[in-house]
Amino acid sequence: MSFDLESNSSGGSTIGRNSSIRLSSGLAPSESTVSLNEIIDLDREFELLLDKLAIEDPIKRKQMQSLPDISKRTLLEQNKADIYRTVKHKGPIESFADVKSVISSINTKHVPIDIIKTLRIHLNTADRDWIQSFLDNDGVQPILNILKRLERNKNRKRKEHSILQWECTRCIAALMKIKIGMEYIASFPQTTNLMVLCLDTPLIKAKTLVLELLAAIAVTDRGHGAVLTSMIYHKEVKKEITRYFNLVQSLKIEKNAEYLTTCMSFINCIISSPSDLPSRIEIRKAFLNLKILKYIENLRADYNEDKNLLTQLDVFEEELSTDEQLNSQQGTQIGIEDLFSQISSRVTGTPSQQELITLMTHFQRMSSSNLGLGVWTLYNALANQLEDELKIHPDLDVTLVSLLFPEVKKSSSGLFGFGSKSKSPSSSPALSSMAKTELKKDNEEKQKTIEHLLKQLNKFSGGQNTERWMIEREEKNKLIAQLMAQTKNGGGGGGGGVGGDSSLSNDEALKRENQLLRMEIENIKNNPSVLLNSGNSINGDVPNLFISSPGSTLSPSPSGEPPIPSTDFGITSSSIHTSTDKLTNSTEPILGSPPPPPPPPMSGGGGPPPPPPPPGGKSNKPAKPIIKPSVKMRNFNWITIPALKVQGTFWDKLDETSFIQSLDKVELESLFSAKAPTVKVESKQLTRKVVVTVIDMKKANNCAIMLQHFKIPNEQLKKMQIMLDEKHFSQENAIYLLQFAPTKEDIEAIKEYQGDQMQLGAAEQYMLTVMDIPKLDSRLKAFIFKQKFEGLVEDLVPDIKAIKAASLELKKSKRLSDILKFILAIGNYVNGSTTRGGAFGFKVLETLPKMRDARSNDNKLSLLHFLAKTLQDRIPEIWNIGAELPHIEHASEVSLNNIISDSSEIKRSIDLIERDFVPMINDPLFAHDKHWIHKITEFQKIAKVQYQRIEKEIDEMNKAFEEITSYFGEPKSTQPDVFFSTINNFLEDLEKAYGEYQAMIRKAELENSKMEDPEKGGLQDLSSQIRSGQLFKDRRVGDSVIAQMQNVDSLRKNLKSTSTTTPNTPPTIKIELPSQSILKPSGQLKK
């Protein structure tokens, strides 16, 4: 029996749907014979198709190859008829068969967002050949051109620009999903330059995607350098303080956990990608200098339940620790300055920073002690002991570590020896030099406090309230007694040497002091003319005590000085100096410190004599005569050198007396007296111009600043505001001048001023010049509105159309309807055993965000993952839902309040022109300005027509939005941005959940099959490794192995050199590998 095959398909080796089998004998053919020939050709063609579709996952290929033959033939026919390459929805680009026509459609000056969205959808589903052709024909460049234009127009921040930027970035992400696209983008420096500039977008999801793409590029061989260069480019273009500044600051500012995770993963990628250690240290140093460790600590506290973010924070710290360990092994190759710099960068901005400063100060102090350079041997021994301890107990709490020094023997009288008066505790041999220093410092501080209290002791700060004065004196005396006792006893404030006798003597002294104080108060009550003044003496050390007679007045002198006391005293000297005498009697003088200052003089002239020198000190130089000015002078806060320290210096034999005589004392006193001297006719003094301000002072000051900004005469400013020439007068200048247009109150205040107009301030002079311009305020407002009208309309109309179109699209979308039906089915099934089951519908805005929160019992999946899987199985074309809802993303960014505000501004401005200028066309008042009046009224007519159209669009928008909210059962008060953003975010999460589900299945299948995925290096593959931290773990393992191999090679070389120098047969040598401790590697040779 013979037969032949005849195919009507375009491919000769493929049996198509219209192929027929004709038998020469008319009998049925042998089934086995036909199947054999079919299978050979069908399998070959189907393998080629799988390669073309870039299906290289072995699990997926196996599933596809197991399809029935009829399904394989259908797929082959669809591919040959170019059905597969045609977009599955109607859009701006009807077919993607011709790659060049697609590229030319986006290579125009004005590209609609819809075209970019359509391209992005196709890039996500196109086969590898199409994407390769797209790249070969330079299809990326038109996308980059769009990003360039958006960056040039960044000053006009429109929502549609941000969305277009976002869609272009998503197109680049779609290209990077496969390896050839990733390699192409990584080797295209212009792409990364434009991508880093997108980090300034207001859309947080766009910033997150950009950082994810940059992170994936940074871990490729050719991409890391491009990303680093682009970050430098970003610093220059955006005028950053330093590189990475904005990036690190975003860790503090942003609150979106997804963004923070991606940002940290990007930082980890650019730090850890270089293979050489110095490069990683240098890059990380820039981040440490920006105090990133402080922000990481805050993120751990604020997001302690976000596993992905915590993983990236762990990666940063683990990479830091690993590189520090490797760096310590190579420490001899690094300069001491670099080591200090690395340590400083490591702790800057952390709580340990102050501890490091204290430690370095301690090192500096100890290196100058008696130990000298031997101190470093001591510290090295301590560090080695601590390192060994951490090896044995890695979880050791370092705050509980104590160093074991030889125990100090204590005498029976206590450590500080309170029973001995001849020895100071600071000189006790039982104390270390450090303890002596600290004790001496403490005593000095207490002595300063005592001296300060002694100076304040005689100050009468209680006014006429003598009881309050007594309380203050008691408290000060008590504190002085305690401090002097502590200083005498060693400053410990306790200890074994403090007995009860000392406390008893202090109590008795205080009782005696109180009795004397009461006697002094009674004396003051009986003689109320006593005045204790708190002013200082000439030398500023001892308070002056002024006493007046009963018949004298207490009013101050005209110069502001205290009244000159009389010689008729009403109080004895013994009662005046009770406090000072009592303190000197109740406590013993301290060796090496001066006694309390002497009492103040009983007369008003001169100051007290200088205090006596300290015991054992040199005598002072003779006191210089005090030259008292005729008026009270201002203070000159210079720092004088004590007389004891002048000897042997430049000042020792210097006599300035002759210079004082040559000074112009009159001029010196007139310039630096405490109060300005009265103006005299004969004095040479510059006359100052009197400036009169009649308007609000704050407004006048701001107006003066504004005039300095323009730096042109008032008449020229007036002319500019009359002409209002758009070529020479900008909108910004008009806004500036509008703030200082003279109001009705300003004009009245200036007109009421009857003085010399030349004495008016700069602000009044300006307003005097321009206030005769009719309706100046309205003119400037009309000019500003005319300048910004076009931008207002360009921003307003697309927003109105987006809400209207998105409302209609949601109502017509069949795919969205199918999704909501499946959600209703799943919800009723899950809640079937509860009162929430059997629902007829659900609140969309409240339910959709909860889909991801409903977790499976193993906490790995959510209802959103299950929904995505179900939709893929039942309605695989559901993922083209974006084609049905092209305006929902734009609508999600629109604020209804902004639409109302902008439209109201247009309405107010049109009414203002119509009210103030349209009736003035024939007004003689505006005869000199007829040209501008004509221009502004003509503009008003055009603007009014456009506004009427906008009003109509707003009415239609409101009607469409009310219908869609009612259609889904949502309240009418719902805001459009809330409504559309909820649905848009849900659809994006749904698509993302499907990708996560596929990745989990793929990972499980690969683990079970023990097969390696041949297609690595795509965006999803790299992002998954980055997020899980596996990419960094693999690198650390590699670095550790390399380091061990290098150490072993070094040991072998040392061993070889040793063996060659020894003439005898070398003994057997056992090599021990270096320790894995992160603190102290201990590679050794054992014989």
Curated annotation (Swiss-Prot):
Residues 589-615 form the FH1 domain. Residues 1013-1051 form the DAD domain. Residues 433-461 form a coiled coil. Its main location: cytoplasm. GO terms for biological process: 'de novo' actin filament nucleation; actin filament polymerization; actin nucleation; barbed-end actin filament uncapping; cell morphogenesis; cell motility; cell-substrate adhesion; cortical actin cytoskeleton organization. Residues 34-394 form the GBD/FH3 domain. Residues 623-1016 form the FH2 domain. The keyword Lyase does not apply. Residues 416-436, 549-558 have a biased composition (Low complexity). One of its GO terms (molecular function) is small GTPase binding. It comes from the Eukaryota. It holds the Pfam family Drf_GBD. PROSITE patterns: FH2, GBD_FH3. Residues 1-23, 569-588 have a biased composition (Polar residues). One of its GO terms (cellular component) is filopodium. Keywords: Actin-binding, Coiled coil, Cytoplasm, Cytoskeleton. Residues 592-616 have a biased composition (Pro residues). It is found in: Cytoplasm, Cell cortex; Cytoplasm, Cytoskeleton. InterPro entries: ARM-like, ARM-type_fold, FH2_Formin, FH2_Formin_sf, FH3_dom, Formin_Homology, GBD/FH3_dom, GTPase-bd. Formins play an important role in the nucleation of actin and the formation of linear actin filaments. Important for cell migration and formation, elongation and maintenance of filopodia. Specifically controls filopodial dynamics by regulating actin turnover at the barbed ends of actin filaments. Belongs to the formin homology family. Diaphanous subfamily. Interacts with vasP, proB/profilin-2 and rac1A. Interacts (via GBD/FH3 domain) with activated Rho-GTPases. This is Formin-H. The gene is forH.
